């Protein structure tokens, strides 16, 4: 999700002159597994290539971890969590201090980290630097402040008893990180787990491993105890599946596809009934009423869909427009999409980079062809842009019907279908007729209508006259298939602790 209010786009928020120069060819960090504060080859000695989505060229090769490596990482994390270990003895205030120190080091190296993200992921450098790295720093600092403020309570009981609760860490927490926001999504999970006193095994996406591996070197520089954070690179069906099935792991947090989320939930149930937090995305929606500020709504919808090349968990891929303004909204949307600058991620004027890899690139082009076959009208874009790499021009479809596959299925790319509606009751019924429910937005100047939508829409988040405003302070999660649990905010911490009830018999109790 976009990490600040979209009434300013990134290019408006910071001019190119205000940005530091990116590093187009950053040095590649250690390409091994990080276990117990040491670098290791995979047990199998296998490696796999990482490809630049902007050029199609191999950036480097990374250790291919699998079950044996996950087992070593889990054992290291379990040892770091043992009773009496330095981590278990550490004051909560000190845990917070270490997280703040990690934020300091990320801030020190933010240009390099942003350059790694753009090289590995293909996103424009200005977004990696202005949005992603800024959010990463804020997340570590925010949850550093929670480390010594999450506590239990005393509970009045009948009889001669004194009762209190303790909030204890779950233990070994595993985190499966997606490729669309590698550092951001890692911080969303790692900061909370460490603030609450857990130890961690992280499996990073095979498409985007390098920023996480560099963060491992910063974790070591901070002085976190060995085994506290372990990072495994590898593929989902091997390393990811090993995490989901491992008996010594107490919690899994996963951000990714609905299909894989189902597999992880099933594996957790078939193994140790470990806790599972799933943020699975899907299709999110926006509803634009006739009284909305047209310029603002068009701008918000463009950024909500095309930001990060459409590779977001809640990209606003359904846009319902009231019939009386549909034609004008369509015209302005197409005009703005044609103006969007697609190109080299390291060009500071670039607004859209390539898709992350060939598989996703070809999948998106397949949906564009499918939309045309189903009868939707291609109004702009839909083309491969540049050879030997994975650019797709911003694409807008009109005349889309609710039963078309481009309407029902997650595309995860720069494809914007537009729908029209006549009545509020009608659009609410259509909007809720889906298995997804992560986020929604409504654009209107009528507060009564806005409040009605916030109550009626079956989504975990509803924005009014804005989109993708996600910060470390507020919880994020979905209804229905987008998953369970919440990330971020105070609510996000609940998944990382167990509540223990302690009851003591006392000889005399007085109020």
From Swiss-Prot:
First and last residues of the transit peptide: 1-11
Compartmental location: Mitochondrion matrix
Sequence positions bearing N6-acetyllysine: 45-46, 377, 393, 420, 423
SUPFAM superfamilies according to UniProt: ALDH-like
GO MF entries: aldehyde dehydrogenase (NAD+) activity
Taxonomic superkingdom: Eukaryota
Keyword Oxidoreductase: yes
Pfam family, one: Aldedh
Modified residues (N6-succinyllysine): 46, 75, 377, 393, 420
Disulfide bond entries: none
Subunit structure: Homotetramer.
Name by which UniProt lists this protein: Aldehyde dehydrogenase X, mitochondrial
Protein species of origin: Bos taurus
């Amino acid at each position: 999700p976009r990490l600040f209010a979209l009434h300013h786009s990134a290019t408006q928020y910071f001019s190119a002159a205000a940005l530091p120069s990116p590093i187009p060819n950053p040095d590649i960090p250690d390409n091994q597994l990080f276990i117990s504060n040491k670098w290791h080859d995979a047990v199998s000695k296998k490696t796999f290539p990482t490809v630049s989505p902007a050029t199609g060229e191999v950036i480097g090769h990374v250790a291919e971890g699998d079950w044996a490596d996950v087992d070593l990482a889990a054992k290291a994390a379990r040892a770091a969590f043992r009773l009496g270990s330095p981590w278990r003895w550490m004051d909560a205030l000190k845990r917070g201090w270490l997280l703040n120190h990690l934020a300091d080091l990320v801030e020190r190296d933010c240009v390099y980290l942003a350059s790694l993200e753009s090289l590995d992921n293909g996103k424009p450098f200005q977004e990696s630097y202005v949005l992603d790295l800024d959010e990463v720093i804020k997340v570590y600092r925010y949850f550093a402040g929670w480390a010594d403020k999450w506590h239990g309570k005393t509970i009045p009981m009948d009889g001669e008893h004194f009762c209190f609760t303790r909030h204890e860490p779950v233990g070994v927490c595993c985190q499966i990180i997606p490729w669309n926001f590698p550092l951001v999504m890692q911080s969303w999970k790692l900061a909370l787990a460490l603030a609450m006193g857990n130890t961690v095994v992280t499996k990073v996406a095979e498409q985007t491993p390098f920023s996480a591996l560099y963060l491992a070197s910063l974790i070591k520089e901070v002085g976190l105890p060995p085994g506290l954070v372990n990072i495994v690179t590898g593929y989902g069906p091997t390393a990811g599946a090993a995490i989901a099935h491992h008996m010594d792991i107490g919690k899994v947090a996963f951000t990714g596809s609905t299909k894989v989320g189902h597999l992880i939930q099933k594996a957790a149930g078939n193994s140790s009934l470990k806790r599972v937090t799933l943020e699975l995305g899907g299709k999110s929606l926006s509803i634009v009423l006739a009284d909305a500020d047209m310029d603002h709504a068009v701008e918000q919808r463009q950024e909500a869909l095309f930001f990060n090349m459409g590779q977001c968990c809640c990209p606003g891929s359904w846009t319902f427009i009231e019939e009386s303004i549909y034609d004008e909204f369509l015209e302005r949307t197409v005009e703005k999409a044609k103006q969007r600058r697609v190109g080299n991620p390291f060009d500071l004027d670039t607004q859209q980079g390539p898709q992350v890899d060939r598989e996703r690139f070809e999948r998106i082009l397949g949906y564009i062809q499918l939309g045309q076959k189903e009868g939707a009208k291609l109004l702009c874009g839909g083309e491969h842009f540049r050879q030997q790499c994975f650019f797709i021009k911003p694409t807008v479809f009109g005349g889309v019907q609710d039963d078309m596959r481009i309407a029902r299925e997650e595309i995860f790319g720069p494809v914007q279908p537009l729908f029209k509606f006549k009545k509020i009751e009608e659009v609410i019924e259509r909007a809720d007729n889906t298995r997804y429910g992560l986020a929604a937005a409504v654009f209107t100047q009528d507060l009564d209508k806005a409040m009605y939508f916030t109550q009626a829409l079956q989504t975990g988040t509803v924005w009014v006259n804005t989109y993708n405003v996600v910060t470390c302070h507020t919880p994020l999660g979905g209804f229905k298939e987008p998953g369970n649990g919440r990330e971020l905010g105070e609510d996000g911490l609940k998944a990382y602790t167990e509540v223990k009830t302690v009851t003591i018999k006392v000889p005399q109790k007085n109020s």
